[in-house]
Structures are given as C-alpha cells and as structure tokens.
Amino acid sequence: MYTRTKTKKVFVGDVQIGGQNKIVLQSMTIAKTKHVKKSLKEINDLVKEGADLVRIAVFDDADKRAIRKVVDQSPCPIIADIHFNPDYAIAAIKAGCKKIRLNPGNIKSKEKLREICLLANQYNIPIRVGVNSGSIPYDLMREYGVTSTAMIIAAQRYVRMLKRFGFDNIVISLKTSSALLSMQAYELGAKKFSYPLHLGITEAGTLINGTIKSVAGLTPLLLKGIGDTIRISLSTNPVDEIKVAKKMLNSLGLYENLVDVVACPTCGRLNFDLFKVTKEIEEFVKDLHFPLKVSILGCSVNGPGEAKEADIGIAGGKQEGIIFKKGVVVKSVKQEYLVDELKQMILEEYELFKKKNGK
C-alpha cells in the first residue's frame, strides 16, 4: 500500500502534495471566475482560514479570459477545474494555473489531450485525474456497476491516456457521495497507485450532514495513512470546508495550527451559561492560528481532573470559578471576570508562541 509518506511528490507551485505526512488543504470558490473581485474575496478568505490551494471553475469564455487576473492577484496557487473543453485547460495553464483538474475521458480529441499533456509538462503543471462515481464510463458501469472496481479501472484507463503522451505528473481522486464506497475506492486506489490521492466525499450535503458524512468516510482512510490532500465538499460557505478539515485533521493529530476549544456536555451541576461562554471563546480564537487546547467545564467538581490534557481552561460556578493550567488550579476568580481572564491567558499563550517561533 502507498501511504502518504510513500506516494510520489507533486508540486502545485511551491506546495508539495505527496511524499510527506502533511495533508494539503484545499477548497473551491463558488463565485463565477469571471467575477474577479468576488473570486479573489473568496480566495483570500480561504487562505486566511488555512487553505493551501484553491480551485476555480472555468465554465465559459468569460471565465477563461478572467483566469490570469485571478491568478496574478491570488495569495496561493490556483487550480483550474475543467470539464469537456480542452481549450480551457490549455488557456488555464498558459494563464498561470498551477494544477489542472480534468477527466481525460471527457476530452474527445486525443490530439487536444496530447497538447494538454505536452504543455503541462512544459510548465511543470500536475493534472488531477478526477474519477467520480456519477461519471463512470458506460462499459464499466454495465460490467461492474457503481463499484470501487469500476472506479479504479476507469482511473487506470485515464492514467494510461496521459502516460501515452509522456505525462506522469498526476494526482488521483476517486469521489462518490457514499462514505462506504469512497472508503473502498480509496483503499483500493492506495494499493494500485503510487500517485498522491486527493480525498473527498462529493455531494456530501449541508454543513452538519456533509460534515458527518465526510468525517465518517475520510477518518478511517487518514488513520491508515491514505490521502495526501483533502477537500471537504459542503453546500455552504467554502470557508466552512477548511474549518471542518482543520478540526477533523486536528482530532487525528494531523494538524496543529489551531486553538482547540473543548467543553463538557453539562449536567445538573451547571451554574452558568456554558453554551454562551463556549461560543464566545470559539469566536475569540477563530483567527489565532497556533496550537493550544482550551477547556471550558461546567463545575469545579470534575473540572481540573477532566482537563488535564488541556493547556489552559476554566471551570465556572455560581459566584466564583477556577482557572487551571495542565489540570492544576492556578487561581480562583469571580464568575463575572472568568471569561475575560481566560481570554487574557489565551493571548499570553499566543504571544509566547509568536516569540518562540520568531513571528
């Protein structure tokens, strides 16, 4: 099996995919590429949240003409999403996109596919071979149905098309809307291909449903070392895709650059508005990109003991709460000042982090 540390290295601009334990985060704009200002606003928001790469759709000639404007002003490498029209892929490469996503089976002209491969080699641009369960070739559907086997054979077929034209700078995705089928496809893909794998559950759904389905389908793969880059596909603001990806990877020990706020589920001992406080702290730390675990607990009965794994935290009360570090109580504070004290401690930890890391 080719785990992420053993897959081939592919570079999207200066971003490495494969051959390492880092999972590259990406998302896709929902603005039309021709709407340059809106596209750039989304791209900047995504990068601020932690995206390494952003994909844009090239749907028509107006989008094609706008690519260079977007690429030239983007703070991260841009990926072009191409369907059917080979001229858009060629234009995207020439306009400075650092990666192309396409389905080689949708490019009817073999001469055009050859031209794309030659140009991508010239510009050192990788191509993601995107296999989707909804577009499995008819002959494979007829023989195998919508199965992981059909998807892998389709991917092998598309890879051969590219290699026939001397192109081997490849990333592969095997997307379905089923968590179980996705797991099967990617596990089989990790055995068959040494190319980096782009993980994702397509058409996953809205924020809650899509998050549940994506985490259910991708976590087992990530724990097995499968997957080099990831997009959490959600029917919501693209920034939420990066937030969910970071939280999921952080819970698996694969992403550190965030403040992890944990809180107890509460019980009858609760004497303050823990839900409100937790949301307030989550909002407070959302732009602080550094590793810290903050615990917010409902009472002092189990507080410090339950929070030993947290860096800092609080346990609230009716009139007074406690503040602790690494499970050790450091002070008692009137309840009305508890949240402000916690915020100050978080900022102090952030300043220490910046000083230690020369930021």
Swiss-Prot record:
Its cofactor is [4Fe-4S] cluster. [4Fe-4S] cluster binds at residues 264, 267, 299, 306. It catalyses: (2E)-4-hydroxy-3-methylbut-2-enyl diphosphate + oxidized [flavodoxin] + H2O + 2 H(+) = 2-C-methyl-D-erythritol 2,4-cyclic diphosphate + reduced [flavodoxin]. Pathway: Isoprenoid biosynthesis; isopentenyl diphosphate biosynthesis via DXP pathway; isopentenyl diphosphate from 1-deoxy-D-xylulose 5-phosphate: step 5/6. Its EC number is 1.17.7.3. InterPro entries: Dihydropteroate_synth-like_sf, Enolase-like_C_sf, IspG_bac, IspG_bac-typ, NO2/SO3_Rdtase_4Fe4S_sf. GO terms for biological process: isopentenyl diphosphate biosynthetic process, methylerythritol 4-phosphate pathway; terpenoid biosynthetic process. Keywords: 4Fe-4S, Iron, Iron-sulfur, Isoprene biosynthesis, Metal-binding, Oxidoreductase. Gene3D superfamilies: Dihydropteroate synthase-like, Sulfite Reductase Hemoprotein, domain 1. One of its GO terms (molecular function) is 4 iron, 4 sulfur cluster binding. Belongs to the IspG family. This is 4-hydroxy-3-methylbut-2-en-1-yl diphosphate synthase (flavodoxin). It comes from Mycoplasmoides gallisepticum (strain R(low / passage 15 / clone 2)). The gene is ispG.
